[in-house]
Amino acid sequence: MAAARSCNGYARREGPPSPKLGTEKPRVSAGSGGSGDGWRGERPRSEEDNELSLPSLAAAYTTILRALGEDPERQGLLKTPWRAATAMQFFTKGYQETIADVLNDAIFDEDHDEMVIVKNIDMFSLCEHHLVPFVGKVHIGYLPNKQVLGLSKLARIVEIYSRRLQVQERLTKQIAIAITEALQPAGVGVVIEATHMCMVMRGVQKMNSKTATSTMLGVFREDPKTREEFLTLIRS
């Protein structure tokens, strides 16, 4: 069972066209789960915030255990609230980082004008509806416009946005917009294929279901041949 919702086997997300030189860059809209101020936005959470909020977060897990009918004082659960609290802070550590942190020294002038693709980037995130994981692969391609990005930084972009409370559709779009804002390329394509534990462990309980989403910007959206080349290469 696949939850793909589109042509070419992938769900297409509507998004703004790729910016051209001299035009205003697109921004991640407020309330979209991003920084609210594009790829240079402020961190919504700091290390100090983590330290200050850890006791209340652990106390919340203690309350959850009691509400489930468990005894937080029994041996196996004595440290569970603190373990769960620190784990949740790690699962959402993307709130402590911005794209500017990793991209400022990794954008290089380069005349390469053919497609750049990094595929099968491992992704782990938390569904914001049920707070259970969804995991999968991210495939990214872009057509440079005089600038390229260090390849490992594409994986870092995925890490920053996936380590937050997310929905897959928004995550796909945020990755594409971040690359577009940073490089102003001729186009960007992002495809995510993921398994959602909220569909596996609860609800319809379909073990083999996968959801595929995509965001195509610039020539990847406007030119069917460019889009098809990208989709063919990530499938190969």
Swiss-Prot record:
Regulation: GTP shows a positive allosteric effect, and tetrahydrobiopterin inhibits the enzyme activity. Zinc is required for catalytic activity. Inhibited by Mg(2+).
Reaction it catalyzes: GTP + H2O = 7,8-dihydroneopterin 3'-triphosphate + formate + H(+)
Main localization, broad class: cytoplasm
UniProt entry tagged with the keyword Aminoacyl-tRNA synthetase: no
Binding site for Zn(2+): C127, H130, C198
GO molecular function, one term: GTP cyclohydrolase I activity
Protein's UniProt keywords contain Iron: no
EC number(s) stated in the UniProt entry for this protein: 3.5.4.16
Coiled coil stretches, renumbered: none
Functional description taken from the UniProt entry: May positively regulate nitric oxide synthesis in endothelial cells. May be involved in dopamine synthesis. May modify pain sensitivity and persistence.
Name used for this protein in its record: GTP cyclohydrolase 1
Record gene name: GCH1
